[in-house]
């Protein structure tokens, strides 16, 4: 909601990214996403997963389906709010995914987006 308040003050060309890593835990998430949709301010939807335990708050994001985020529920909120743009995969994973061959990572991303998201 704070980001949306800022958007209102800065004008119609400013919006928000629904980044699941940063908002999945918020009990007011559904209301905030609905508000962003009413304002036409959802500009992006970033996906990954929250691993338990998390080894590093920045560089240990999980592949979709490996953690605890209810990705289908959040995607439904985003789509119910009127955003049907692409989901942007954001896997910051210094000790896991960044060490794997790119072709392998892309294959897993494709499979997970189709089956988990």
Predicted segments — roles?
Residues 1-18, 22-117:
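Histidine-acidic metal/acid-base catalytic patches
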């Amino acid at each position: 909601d704070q980001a949306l308040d800022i958007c209102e003050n800065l004008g119609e060309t400013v919006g928000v990214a629904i980044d699941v890593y940063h908002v999945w835990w918020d009990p007011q998430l559904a209301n905030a996403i609905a508000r962003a949709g009413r304002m036409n301010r959802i500009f992006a939807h970033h996906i990954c997963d929250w691993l338990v335990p998390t080894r590093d708050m920045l560089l240990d994001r999980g592949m979709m389906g490996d953690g605890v985020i209810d990705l289908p529920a959040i995607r439904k909120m985003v789509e119910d709010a009127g955003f049907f743009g692409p989901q942007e995969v954001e896997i910051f994973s210094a000790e896991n995914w960044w060490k794997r061959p790119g072709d392998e990572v892309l294959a897993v991303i494709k499979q997970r987006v189709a089956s988990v998201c």
